[in-house]
């Protein structure tokens, strides 16, 4: 199997979608997981104010609201968690996203003290973190907090990973990539926008430039700059359309380089890396 065939098979992106149907598919998927695992009662999600967490949060709240209505069990709850490192530059967008999704519970946990303490402890041990490595510390601290909240509310942590992100491995291993359930996987970036439009989301939340915003020295660095390829090109590639050869090569290189992120810890029986 050629590399592109393998990528398209792995990422499961349809050439065209019906936004309403995909919304229902994600909501029913989330509900089915709770129905199968009756000891689970909540979803927990970190909210940044970007497209992916806005969409995921709205879908998670819809699923939880429907579970309450269907079962009469008020223990079903959605926890939307703001996790700033100090002060977030686009805090107004996060508030707009929260107002759009109308979560049952809003929590704020500032991760700055925890991250800075880890950085200082490592420095004391002779390990000076680069700005990039510190950025990954932020992502992992955010996930640690979400799992702590989930542990106290019979919950699972919902991920925002979609296929345009998964193909490039553009997330932190065991950070924002370390979640329990990903309702957006199979969608690319433009398809996620289509779902938000269908849901009546404020336009500025899905038109803003995507950024991981993890590095102190490169605040709000656009994803497309970091990747060296645009989301339109990634989306076209995943839909089986023609893309420039250099863009295809970059996408395929990212896919190969980040293969380890799409697997749990490697065992002696794994051979994808050989």
From Swiss-Prot:
It catalyses: deamido-NAD(+) + NH4(+) + ATP = AMP + diphosphate + NAD(+) + H(+). It comes from the Bacteria. Deamido-NAD(+) binds at residues 140, 173, 180, 260-261. Mg(2+) binds at residues 52, 165. ATP binds at residues 46-53, 160, 189, 211. Transmembrane segments: none annotated. One of its GO terms (molecular function) is metal ion binding. Its EC number is 6.3.1.5. It holds the Pfam family NAD_synthase. Keywords: ATP-binding, Ligase, Magnesium, Metal-binding, NAD, Nucleotide-binding. GO terms for cellular component: cytoplasm. Belongs to the NAD synthetase family. Homodimer. Catalyzes the ATP-dependent amidation of deamido-NAD to form NAD. Uses ammonia as a nitrogen source. This is NH(3)-dependent NAD(+) synthetase. It comes from Listeria monocytogenes serotype 4a (strain HCC23). The lineage of its organism: Bacteria, Bacillati, Bacillota, Bacilli, Bacillales. The gene is nadE.
């Amino acid at each position: 199997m050629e590399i592109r065939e393998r990528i398209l098979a792995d990422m499961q992106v349809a050439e065209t979608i019906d936004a309403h149907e995909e919304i229902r598919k994600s909501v029913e998927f989330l509900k089915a997981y709770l129905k199968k695992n009756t000891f689970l009662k909540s979803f927990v999600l970190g909210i940044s104010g970007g497209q992916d967490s806005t969409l995921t949060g709205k879908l998670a709240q819809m699923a939880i609201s429907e579970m309450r209505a269907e079962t009469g069990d008020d223990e079903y709850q959605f926890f939307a968690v703001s996790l700033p490192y100090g002060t977030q530059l686009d805090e107004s967008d996060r508030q707009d996203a929260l107002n759009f999704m109308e979560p049952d519970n809003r929590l704020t946990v500032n991760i700055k003290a925890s991250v800075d303490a880890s950085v200082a402890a490592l420095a004391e041990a002779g390990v000076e973190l680069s700005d990039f490595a510190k950025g990954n510390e932020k992502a992992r601290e955010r996930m640690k907090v979400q799992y702590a909240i989930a542990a106290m509310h019979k919950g699972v942590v919902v991920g925002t990973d979609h296929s345009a992100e998964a193909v490039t491995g553009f997330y932190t291993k065991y950070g924002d990539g370390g979640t329990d359930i990903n309702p957006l996987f199979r969608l690319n970036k433009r398809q996620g926008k289509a779902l938000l439009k269908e849901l009546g989301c404020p336009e500025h939340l899905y038109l803003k430039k995507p950024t991981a915003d993890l590095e102190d020295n490169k605040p709000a660095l656009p994803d497309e700059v970091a990747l060296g390829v645009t989301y339109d090109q990634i989306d076209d590639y995943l839909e089986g359309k023609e893309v420039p050869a250099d863009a295809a090569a970059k996408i395929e290189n990212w896919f190969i380089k980040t293969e380890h992120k799409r697997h749990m810890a490697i065992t002696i029986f794994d051979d994808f890396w050989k």
